[in-house]
Amino acid sequence: MNIVILAAGTGKRMRSALPKVLHPLAGRPLLSHVIATARTLQPSRLVVVVGHGAEQVQAAVAAPDVQFAVQAEQLGTGHAVRQALPLLDPAQPTLVLYGDVPLTRATTLKRLVDAAHDGRYGILTVTLDDPTGYGRIVRDAAGFVTRIVEQKDASPEQLKIAEINTGIIVTPTAQLSMWLGALKNENAQGEYYLTDVVELAIEAGFEIVTTQPDDDWETLGVNSKAQLAELERIHQRNVADALLVEGVTLADPARVDVRGTLRCGRDVSIDVNCVFEGDVTLADDVTVGPNCVIRNASIGAGTRIDAFTHIDGAQLGANTVIGPYARLRPGAQLADEAHVGNFVEVKNAVIGHGSKANHLTYIGDADIGARVNIGAGTITCNYDGANKFRTVIEDDVFVGSDTQLVAPVRVGRGVTIAAGTTVWKDVAEGTLALNEKTQTAKSGYVRPVKKKS
């Protein structure tokens, strides 16, 4: 089977410099959703017709299995499909999809393809309560499709028809070439419409078959930011419903966004206003508090993530405790039972089993062993303005508050570092590290007082 995806439109109503089909839905371009669905049908040829912003669109979705045809002039859907003909296998049927219709299920498309077997012409239709603006499917007394009539050309009787054309079709490819060549652009827009092919197929004696999607929203397209927002909410609610079926507890299914892939174990609980991006895995018994962002991360079983935590590119072991207001950046790796508390940032660092950094700390480019306590205000000074260096803290170290560790530096096993210490040399195992300081109390000191104006 050939699949052609039309993605050449300008999208003027989007009021954006970005090509319409590249606007994101759930974190991915609209066109990427359509291509992903198309791939599930295993086409022998997958062709995307580009036009407006062609180079940008091609760069965004380029892949070994995707070919591109260019529609240099915007002369209608029929003209667009004609540009793809040289790339199609004429012996196989062609399914035509749209790059701005991202939510059509693969099962819906397969049902249409199956119905159009043996050279039939298939149309995906939908019945709407309000079909205003759409082309109507006209049938004869026996129920056979005779034509598609556009809203502006419909008679009062035809305007009562609720079944409309979605534009998604399956057609014999060899005949399609002939039909497209016969199209005329005698309309107000001066364009060649793919819908006009239906009458040519009927005249040629081809049987027209129709199928419908399970849900009307599967055929909704995007022509404005308002429509994009509407489809985003439909998609996110579908994702939330699927999570609920899997046994995930959602505090409010309307207030969780998944912009990628979210895999959840048993008894996972997610509070409100959480966003999951990229590839995220939550193991059994993970609890995610409100207002968290988790991107490209693996979260171990029994972990608790408190409110307003941001996790990006991190790997967490089992029974860790994160947040509130913590930030784990790419390369952060936490072993089982590690704690990272409020206003702690971890980047490209390993934190060992049972180690804790509970408050106001920066840990970057570091290797921290097991059972280490990192006091409040500790900083690994890892950057000299040009190069990054690592800090190594071995097992059972106690780091006092307001400590600066100037990398590269190694702190041996069982070391205690006194509060307020700057460590710039390696510290031997089992010792106390401190900076000698003198504290003086001066009597008779008078604090300055502001003069009153």
UniProtKB/Swiss-Prot annotation:
Protein name (record): Bifunctional protein GlmU
GO molecular function terms attached to this record: glucosamine-1-phosphate N-acetyltransferase activity; magnesium ion binding; UDP-N-acetylglucosamine diphosphorylase activity
Required cofactor(s): Mg(2+)
Active-site positions on this chain: H359
Annotated Mg(2+) binding sites: D100, N223
CDD domains: GT2_GlmU_N_bac, LbH_GlmU_C
Linker as annotated region, ranges: 226-246
Region of interest: N-acetyltransferase: 247-453
Entry-linked NCBIfam families: glmU
UniProt KW Metal-binding keyword: yes
Reactions the enzyme catalyzes: alpha-D-glucosamine 1-phosphate + acetyl-CoA = N-acetyl-alpha-D-glucosamine 1-phosphate + CoA + H(+); N-acetyl-alpha-D-glucosamine 1-phosphate + UTP + H(+) = UDP-N-acetyl-alpha-D-glucosamine + diphosphate
Subunit structure: Homotrimer.
Location in the cell: Cytoplasm
Residues involved in UDP-N-acetyl-alpha-D-glucosamine binding: 6-9, 20, 71, 76-77, 98-100, 135, 150, 165, 223, 329, 347, 362, 373
Family designation: In the N-terminal section; belongs to the N-acetylglucosamine-1-phosphate uridyltransferase family.
Main location: cytoplasm
Chain positions covered by the region annotation Pyrophosphorylase: 1-225
Associated pathway: Nucleotide-sugar biosynthesis; UDP-N-acetyl-alpha-D-glucosamine biosynthesis; N-acetyl-alpha-D-glucosamine 1-phosphate from alpha-D-glucosamine 6-phosphate (route II): step 2/2; Nucleotide-sugar biosynthesis; UDP-N-acetyl-alpha-D-glucosamine biosynthesis; UDP-N-acetyl-alpha-D-glucosamine from N-acetyl-alpha-D-glucosamine 1-phosphate: step 1/1; Bacterial outer membrane biogenesis; LPS lipid A biosynthesis
Purpose: Catalyzes the last two sequential reactions in the de novo biosynthetic pathway for UDP-N-acetylglucosamine (UDP-GlcNAc). The C-terminal domain catalyzes the transfer of acetyl group from acetyl coenzyme A to glucosamine-1-phosphate (GlcN-1-P) to produce N-acetylglucosamine-1-phosphate (GlcNAc-1-P), which is converted into UDP-GlcNAc by the transfer of uridine 5-monophosphate (from uridine 5-triphosphate), a reaction catalyzed by the N-terminal domain.
Binding site for acetyl-CoA: A376, N382, Y383, S401, A419
EC number, as in UniProt: 2.7.7.23, 2.3.1.157
Gene3D superfamilies for this protein: Hexapeptide repeat proteins, Spore Coat Polysaccharide Biosynthesis Protein SpsA, Chain A
GO cellular component: cytoplasm; membrane
A GO biological process held by the record: lipid A biosynthetic process
